[in-house]
Amino acid sequence: MIEEEIEVDVDIKTRADKFHKFIRRSQHVPKATHYIKGCDLLEGEWGKVGSILLWKLVFDGEPRVSKDMIEVIDEEKNVIQLRVLEGPLKKEYKSFLKTMKVMSPKHGGPGSVVKWNMKYERIDQNVDHPNRLLQFFVEVTKEIDQYLLSKD
């Protein structure tokens, strides 16, 4: 199989730096969305490359966990990249990499754009592309945006 990729842009009202900073502090994300029930630090330090996180979430109405390693944090470009190490995704994908980049809007103005990108290699052709997971991240992003706006 070959590595494949899907992505989506989500327009938000929160500034790019503020959104990125909040996501980087993963332990606070469960406060902002009902989809994420917890995030535990298993190894390393919060918000540092090489750290391993255990996400507890609700996906398609079912509780799930995902053990991820932070591979990239770029404060200047507002990028965070996580590699899935363990969890349900590893049963269907040989590799799975999630990248979030927060940018200023293309046409200027307030707010920002969150680009979610997923690179993955399916175990076989019978495994679906992760479109539902991409939509999950759209919903999580919108809820976090609303939470951050309510804190201004």
From Swiss-Prot:
InterPro entries linked to this entry: Bet_v_I/MLP (IPR000916), MLP-like_ligand-binding (IPR051761), START-like_dom_sf (IPR023393)
GO biological process: defense response
UniProt gene name: MLP165
Organism: Arabidopsis thaliana (Mouse-ear cress)
Stated name of the protein: MLP-like protein 165
Family, per entry: Belongs to the MLP family.
SMART domains on file: Bet_v_1
